[in-house]
């Protein structure tokens, strides 16, 4: 069983389907021919998340028979991905959704019609220019990570041949401008708040520099700013797509699926002909398009207003997912866990995040309307976090915790204060913040040391709690005032919020000695 059998037509469909593989229900070659002539969508970033989500939902849309164009992928960073993960398989891939019950769903993705290297050294660049000049193009999109939208003075100074992704995109938009100021929507699909603004800032930085240097007419910048021509909508995307999993490779090999080799590029991109991802997924997109759009709603995407996209993001990062992640990661590191899924088998930790979510954060949740917060958090607790296929670690999530606490917990505390709600309902959120002062010591509950995860404020905050010792009977905890009064770390001055003394008391319990973290966690969770 090989992907190229599907491309050649030499495929025993009954065998594939008997083994649980969903095959494309559309004419792959007809879609490619149509897309080559009248492209509608170019996506930048050919990594695992693209194949597992945007390409997969377009595949679902094509399977309905109500749409007939594919997506053209362009890689700006790691060109080996095109050579090794796309070209040998005629741009086909296998999407494997990993279910929390240990089963897997297998779907052949055939929606990618071309895979191009987005750089001037390749002939693919001329193909991209040709596509950008085509009036049929409706949308370009991105999964290049938040770092992919950055730029620097050196690249801005390279003129019309920059090397950073945003510069290349600006150069292609210049081609579209020169072809008659054709309309287009520039859509980020990266997992960061207000992602459309990040693309916009990057593109505008290059355009403004080029205008200032006299390389392009001022009308080009006017074109980019004209929202009847060019828009930069926001979106919220949520789907975990880890590197190819050994267990998945073994399951596919048992089926007789032969395209299961791991690929590691020189730039250390980990990929394969298959991509594995969690089963749960969300894509909510601001419906602000200037030249029509691919009907991704046929594959499950939600189109809505910018305000609603922002509400979905707020629901996720302040209530239904991110606070739970951080709480269990702080305590998970101290209790010696290395897998989030393993933490979910710990009754104290599972109850801890359930009660934070349902009892403390939910009373002030932002309800976006298009997604139900209770269904969302239910999927997080019952399907996403316990998923045995997800190799996520508390140590990874604990990275940059000082930068995350203001949003993940500070916003909830602010809402309690603004609405005059009873702060006595806040017990486990304060326990999370108390746990941070214990986490900073880098000592597990069994007394052994651990390395706190990288954080730009780690040394500064560790210095504040340096006078404290785990297991010392009598000690001065006044240093905590310098920590919990920091609105830059917690979103609010916790003493002004009326929570500082409560948190101090919890810290004292956590510092009592070996076993105190477990004892304190159990005490407060059980009493809730």
Where are these regions (language model features)?
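Substrate/ligand-engaging "lid" and interaction regions
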Residues: 1-44, 48-528
